[in-house]
Curated annotation (Swiss-Prot):
Stated role: Catalyzes the conversion of acetate into acetyl-CoA (AcCoA), an essential intermediate at the junction of anabolic and catabolic pathways. AcsA undergoes a two-step reaction. In the first half reaction, AcsA combines acetate with ATP to form acetyl-adenylate (AcAMP) intermediate. In the second half reaction, it can then transfer the acetyl group from AcAMP to the sulfhydryl group of CoA, forming the product AcCoA.
UniProt superkingdom: Bacteria
GO biological-process terms attached to the record: acetyl-CoA biosynthetic process from acetate
Organism: Ralstonia pickettii (strain 12J)
Keyword annotations of the record: Acetylation, ATP-binding, Ligase, Magnesium, Metal-binding, Nucleotide-binding
Changes after translation: Acetylated. Deacetylation by the SIR2-homolog deacetylase activates the enzyme.
One term of GO molecular function: acetate-CoA ligase activity
Protein name per the record: Acetyl-coenzyme A synthetase
Entry binding sites for ATP: 397-399, 421-426, 512, 528, 539
One cellular component (GO) term of this entry: cytosol
Length: 660
């Protein structure tokens, strides 16, 4: 791995606008370096100061970091606090009670607003209802819900009473839901009758019933149902209750349950893992601290900002930057039930215009699909909308290709909005590397530098640092407060997955390849380690080849995987979506040849894809991530045996098979 080659050079640099720097929470690189120096000089003192300043403690902590049982690190362990108190009471006490916390827009465009006072009352009523059912501190509650105020209420109510929640994305199958219910040992399930996406009703309660009919789910004594559509659903007497009935008659106040800073706030299962699902366990204190700090640092949050993260609460982004971070920071945020292409592909831009959104945070995949839509239909091009309220853009979920970055910067940000290209993971709890919008000069496609206190590095297979300009394995050298605590019920797997002995057992393995710029030290993520290609002895990250393909003016989106090849060891297989309709026959061969030559010119002959297939789109999860493991199977000509329950567009698999 030490020899991953970087073959794509990016020379464009965009400095933060002076007007942005003047009012930034971290203004200029000197301010960033001062925070980094504070952390370098006194690591525990740095984190202790931030935890004292930014969190409300019921019992102050006396010990900052306990490394005695590494890698099972503990932060602020003897301190006690409550996450819901830090998100809700904090705002009632500091003058935000009548500030709008959530602007919620349904799939079909209905808008409602919930103030902090109203949200607090709803969370308290539901928390009281949970307690009345006998749910208590330490119990695990699975939440299988649509994007909704009710989903956030359910999470906050669990936190309020010390119950650990495990949110399962509403696109998962009954089997996936059952596996998670069993693994986490849930005593209750909170779901909805149906969820609305793109004008279609999807039967959540029916899927939940199917999951609960499978073995191992007997511990679930209560099923609470949010009536989203009032659809006709099966009802089990004594087990099933409507959410509004659980709240009915309960008082608007609910004493919080203080918990240790190390108490598990939630367990979130990582998507795409093979075999037994991997439950990532997060703490309360360290996790909440970082969710709040990154709202202020990365998103430069201001009191009057309208913040919009387009993620789903079923993923970590929806935990940190919808359910917890914005509320702890006292923000007003947009929460959206639907999809970016319904009723048309101008939905996001229309919502930014109507709600006067200031900060917009979305996935590169969404951006790429909306680029294609804008090229195909002038009516949904962002230039048709007033996006002047925007001051900051962000990307999350995967690296963004430089050309998609440029389109986002020009067409959505009007050339004036910094872009925070955030690198982080379910396991890290919050941002790890990202530009700071009022400080960091931006380079398209680079997540730039680690946040203060994050000791990231690039190493070889033995755990030794590699020089800037040479690719290697991305690691973090010191524990940080919001990191994963363990894999639920499987500490050995946790150690092997994240602190492998091959790297000395002390370095956190991110699982990504990375390279640092020779001059600036900026990090670029080169894709997952298992996405590294080895063609005739040359090791290349898939990200660079994808970026080269997307730089071609006819290409909307591309994903690159490897497949075994007798001659070169591994051959490059590219799946490409054009900005126009999908070609076939001789035309497909001709365009494939043009794209091969294009990549050869952009990178070099060694990077030319052997196999190029064209699709109307790519297989993606509903959160917008490309399902590369499915593409690897398609490239090899294998039957698809993996779980495809989160796949947004299953028909695409047959299309991509046929284009071989």
């Amino acid at each position: 791995m030490a020899g991953i080659e970087s073959v794509l050079q990016e020379t464009r640099v965009f400095n933060p606008p002076e007007s942005f720097v003047k009012q930034a929470n971290i203004a200029g690189m000197d301010a960033y370096r001062a925070l980094c120096a504070e952390a370098e000089h006194d690591y525990e003192g740095f984190w202790a100061r931030l935890a004292h300043e930014h969190l409300l403690w019921h019992k102050p902590f006396s010990k900052v970091l306990d490394e005695s049982n590494a890698p099972f690190y503990k932060w602020f362990e003897d301190g006690e606090l409550n996450a819901s108190y830090n998100c809700l009471e904090r705002n009632l006490e500091n003058g935000n009670a009548d500030k709008v916390a959530i602007i919620f827009e349904t799939d079909d465009g209905k808008v409602s607003r919930t103030t902090y006072r109203e949200l607090h009352a709803r969370v308290c009523r539901f928390a009281n209802g949970l307690k009345a059912l006998g749910i208590k501190k330490g119990d695990r509650v699975v939440i299988y819900m649509p994007m909704s105020v009710e989903g956030i209420v359910a999470m906050q109510a669990c936190a309020r009473i010390g119950a650990t929640h495990s949110v399962v994305f509403g696109g998962f199958s009954a089997k996936s839901l059952q596996e998670r219910i069993v693994d986490v040992g849930a005593v209750a399930l909170i779901t909805a009758d149906e969820q609305m996406r793109g004008g279609k009703a999807l039967p959540l309660k029916a899927i939940a019933d199917e999951a609960l009919a499978m073995e191992g789910t007997d511990a679930v004594k209560h099923v609470i149902v949010y009536r989203r559509t009032n659809g006709n659903v099966n009802w089990v007497e004594g087990r099933d209750r409507a959410m509004d009935e659980v709240e009915a008659g309960q008082p608007d106040t609910c004493e919080v349950t203080p918990v240790s800073a190390e108490h598990p706030l939630f367990i979130l299962y990582t998507s795409g893992s093979t075999g037994k699902p991997k439950g990532v366990q997060h703490s309360t204190g360290g996790y909440l601290l970082w969710a709040l700090l990154t709202m202020q640092w990365t998103f430069d949050l201001k009191p009057d900002d309208i913040f919009w993260c387009t993620a789903d609460i079923g993923w970590v982004t929806g935990h940190s930057y919808i359910a917890y971070g914005p509320l702890a920071a006292g923000a007003t945020q947009v929460v959206f039930e639907g999809v970016p292409t319904y009723p048309n592909a101008g939905r996001f831009w229309d919502m930014i215009q109507r709600h006067k959104v200031n900060t917009f945070y979305t996935a590169p995949t969404a951006i790429r699909s909306l680029i294609k839509a804008a090229e195909a239909d002038e009516k949904v091009h962002p230039k048709q909308y007033d996006l002047s309220s925007l001051r900051l853009l962000g990307t999350v979920g995967e690296p963004i290709n430089p050309e998609a970055w440029m389109w986002y910067h020009t067409n959505i940000g009007g050339g004036r909005c910094p872009i925070v290209d955030t690198f982080w993971q379910t396991e890290t709890g919050g941002h790890m590397m990202t530009p700071l919008p009022g400080a960091t000069p931006l380079v398209p496609g680079s997540c730039t530098l680690p946040l203060p206190g994050i000791m990231a590095a690039v190493v070889d297979e033995t755990g030794h640092d590699v020089p800037n300009g040479q690719g290697g394995i991305l690691v973090v050298k010191r524990p940080w407060p919001s990191m994963i605590r363990t894999i639920w019920g499987d500490p050995e797997r946790f150690k092997k997955s994240y602190f492998p002995e091959e790297l000395g057992g002390k370095l956190y393995l991110a699982g990504d390849g990375s390279i640092r710029d020779k001059d600036t030290g900026y990090f670029t993520i080169m894709g997952r380690i298992d996405d590294v290609l080895n063609v005739s002895g040359h090791r290349m990250g898939t990200m660079e080849i994808e970026s080269a393909l997307v730089a071609n003016p006819i290409v909307a989106e591309a994903a690159v995987v490897g497949r075994p090849d007798d001659m070169t060891g591994e051959a490059i297989c590219a799946f490409v979506v054009l900005k126009r309709s999908r070609p076939d026959g001789d035309e497909a061969k001709q365009i494939a040849n043009e794209l091969r030559n294009w990549v050869g010119k952009e990178i070099g002959p060694i990077a030319k894809p052997k196999d190029i297939r064209f699709g109307d789109n790519l297989p993606k999860t509903r959160s917008g991530k490309i399902m590369r493991r499915l593409l690897r199977s398609l490239a090899k000509g294998e039957d698809i045996t993996q779980d495809t329950s989160t796949l947004e567009n299953p028909a695409i698999l047959d299309q991509l098979k046929e284009t071989r």
